Amino acid sequence: SEVHAFTMFDNFYGSGGRIFDTAYIYNNGMGDKYLGQWINSRQLEKEIIVIGKAAHTPQCEPQFIRPQILESLERLQIKKLDIFCLHRDNSEVPVAEFIDALTEIKEEGLIDLIGASNWELDRFSEARAYAFKEKKEPFKVLSNNFSLAEMIEPVWPGCVGVNDAYMEYILKEEILLFPWSSQ
């Protein structure tokens, strides 16, 4: 409910939290809506960072990214996402198609930093290599599972964790890691 969401957001913000992670699919869009209402009611758009995600399975294709971002922005009542991550990967789609779509959306001013959530290291690094080669916008953010407990089996289909090789890459390439973990 809105009351429950506002209470959680107020407690998080009051404890110093300034980064809010949301996604197009969370609670059928109500996650975005409640967060947007809270941001607007507290006039905090310039005080916080919003991480948004879209293109979750089965709509994990480039043509779904922009419309889902626009719908999320409307729900959130903000003009742009500070950070945007593709929510899942679709290995049947060339990384170039994702990077090209995200570069266009960034050039429109709808997102600042781009990244990926639940992408394997080979695809993530391939996407960055393509972006640098073609002078496109590279992934600068990763939001994979990472915690003190190693994920043996994915919590949900398509989830990817950060292993030692991935961590070496993240550190070497100076990727911002916004991990998630089941609770």
Model region roles, listed by residue range:
Residues 1-12, 60-76, 97-100, 124-129:
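Short, acidic/polar
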Residues 1-48, 107:
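N-terminal binding-site loop/beta-alpha segment at the start of enzyme catalytic domains
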Residues 1-3, 53-64, 87-93, 156:
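Active-site mouth loops of central-metabolism enzymes
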Residues 5, 20, 35, 50, ...:
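Conserved, mostly hydrophobic/aromatic
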Residues 14, 36-49, 70-77, 102-106, ...:
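Acidic (Asp/Glu)-rich catalytic clusters
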Residues 19-26, 85-86, 112-117:
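Short catalytic-loop micro-motif centered on adjacent basic/acidic residues
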Residues 46-57, 84, 141-146:
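A short, structured active-site edge motif that brings together acidic residues
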Residues 89, 93-183:
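Beta/alpha (TIM)-barrel catalytic core signal, keyed to glycine-rich beta->alpha loops juxtaposed to Asp/Glu
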